[in-house]
């Protein structure tokens, strides 16, 4: 409900996005994953990514994620976010992983908290999503806080 991108108008748009992702996997700084069930790995139910380039000056990665409504409140997103946080600390070597959510979407904040991220504050009218201009709640975890 609180996406920062427009929904795809038809399947050709989705196919184009997926082609772009596949092409970008050749880059060393592209971090985008589909979320799938282990038993049904050909059926994505969500995605998670580093949504801004990693800030090398401070070692910061900003994460964005989404999952289909039928899979809300099942711990799937927390498992995926936790795995990506560990990957970014252990394999990429970042010092800080952060994310944000629309203040009207507290369940996203609950996912972040469950993964050890700490609430850092709300930036008023600092973001835009498909609901319009919104307040953004920021969470982060540092490498030495795991």
Annotated model-derived regions:
Residues 10-12, 25, 131, 146:
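A short hydrophobic/aromatic micro-motif that marks alpha-helical segments and, especially, helix-coil
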Residues 14, 18, 26, 64-66:
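Intrinsically disordered, low-complexity regions enriched in Ser/Pro/Gly/Gln/His and often acidic
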